[in-house]
Design a protein with these regions (language model features):
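Active-site beta-strand->loop->alpha-helix modules in alpha/beta enzyme cores, enriched
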Residues: 1-71
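The feature marks non-catalytic terminal segments
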Residues: 64-164
Length: 164
């Protein structure tokens, strides 16, 4: 994670074609049928190339997954329309999540508690200065609605707003 790659360099270094990555993500959308997708910052937070590629592919794959004409290269042939896409740190249509609210479904633990525990399992990150934080330049509670098929958010604190 110490290295910084442009989006073009990331695809080239891994030997990935954008088309194959977009197709893979579009197939994943069709297979899993998410209403909401939440992903990385388009600038890779601190410049992380894989984060940039994730955000790039997440955006491009929405149209492909929904396109009935985009069948010949897809394993999952039923089109799927993702309803909303949120990007971390995206400045348009901002949303601020409250990760400190206790969740009854998780015995009163907060989303922040769970994220912190999950981050501890990300072994390669334990040798870095990165932490789970809901403040500062990489505030993990800040997102923006980059795409919506169901209208803009009004409450600005709920990824599932406007979904039935």
């Amino acid at each position: 994670d110490k290295y910084q790659l442009t989006l073009k360099e990331m695809y080239a270094q891994k030997g990935w074609s954008r088309e194959s990555v977009y197709r893979f993500v579009a197939e994943t959308y069709r297979a899993c049928r998410p209403d909401v997708v939440v992903t990385q910052d388009v600038n890779g937070e601190y410049g992380h190339g894989a984060h940039r590629a994730a955000a790039d592919a997440a955006q491009a794959a929405i149209a492909l997954a929904a396109d009935e004409k985009y069948q010949e290269k897809m394993t999952h042939s039923e089109p799927w329309q993702v309803k909303k896409l949120y990007l971390h740190l995206y400045e348009q249509n901002p949303v601020k999540m409250d990760w400190r609210k206790p969740l009854a479904a998780f015995g009163g633990q907060t989303a922040f508690d769970l994220a912190s525990r999950a981050f501890e399992c990300h072994i390669s990150q334990q040798r870095t200065d990165y932490h789970v934080e809901d403040f500062g330049p990489y505030d993990n509670s800040k997102f923006g609605l980059a795409y919506s098929a169901v209208g803009e958010d009004v409450q600005k604190d709920d990824f599932f707003e406007n979904l039935e």
